[in-house]
């Protein structure tokens, strides 16, 4: 008797499945097709994205080679092209390198590029600080001390990545401006920071020695 009931149950299930298929089968097929298309489209995008990244990497290395060979004009043009059309990560790297090449012939124009990068919040604070530091390094020999302070003092806070370099540049700018008080302030800050790199510490000690020699002369 139980076999009869089982056969009836199976027949009912088959009939239900048949009705469901007749009603919704076309939608199931469409969903499967869309899934296949979506997966295929994603795979195509991944392939295309990897291809573009590889091309940008090759172009970046070629531009670096031009710079190494002293072909600065060609390197500048290559970095500018990549900064305009490369993948997002290489665009940023290329923009920094473009500014470095521009600085060889036109420091003012290079500062403008670095200022643009420093103002771009999409880069994140570390890269923004790096751009601001690079601009300050270009200007340290020519700009008034007050301008260097305005640019670099925010970078000297204990939580900033490039604080040691920023403090060093400010100490140098103060020395050039013959502002002994400011130079001592930044020098003391550098020497008191236990995380100051030994190279930076040595440079400041040399700067202090030069300042002492200036006093005696």
Where are these regions (language model features)?
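N-terminal positive-inside, membrane-proximal cytosolic segments immediately preceding the first
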Residues: 1-34, 55
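Short extracytoplasmic
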Residues: 58-93
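Flexible helix-coil transition and linker loops at the boundaries of alpha-helical arrays
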Residues: 47-48, 83-85, 119-122
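Soluble extracytoplasmic domains of inner/organellar membrane proteins
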Residues: 89-217
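Transmembrane signal-anchor/signal-peptide helices with a preference for the extracytoplasmic
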Residues: 38-60
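Amphipathic alpha-helices of TPR/Sel1-like and other helical repeat/solenoid scaffolds
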Residues: 16, 74-82, 114-117, 151-152
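Short, low-structural-confidence N-terminal segments
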Residues: 26, 32, 36-46, 216
């Amino acid at each position: 008797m139980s076999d009869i009931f089982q056969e009836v149950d199976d027949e009912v299930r088959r009939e239900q499945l048949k009705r469901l298929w007749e009603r919704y089968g076309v939608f199931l097929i469409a969903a499967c097709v869309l899934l296949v298309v979506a997966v295929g489209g994603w795979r195509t995008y991944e392939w295309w994205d990897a291809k573009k990244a590889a091309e940008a990497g090759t172009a970046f290395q070629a531009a670096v080679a031009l710079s190494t060979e002293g072909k600065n004009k060609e390197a500048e043009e290559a970095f500018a092209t990549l900064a305009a059309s490369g993948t997002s990560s290489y665009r940023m790297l290329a923009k920094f390198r473009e500014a470095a090449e521009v600085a060889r012939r036109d420091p003012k124009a290079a500062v403008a590029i670095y200022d643009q990068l420093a103002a771009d919040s999409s880069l994140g604070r570390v890269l923004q600080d790096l751009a601001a530091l690079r601009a300050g390094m270009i200007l340290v020999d020519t700009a008034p001390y007050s301008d260097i302070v305005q640019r670099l003092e925010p970078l000297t806070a204990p939580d900033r990545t490039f604080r040691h370099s920023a403090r060093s540049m400010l100490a140098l700018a103060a020395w050039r401006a013959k502002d002994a008080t400011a130079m001592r302030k930044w020098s003391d800050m550098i020497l008191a920071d236990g995380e100051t790199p030994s190279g930076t510490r040595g440079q400041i000690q040399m700067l202090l020695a030069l300042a002492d020699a200036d006093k005696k002369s």
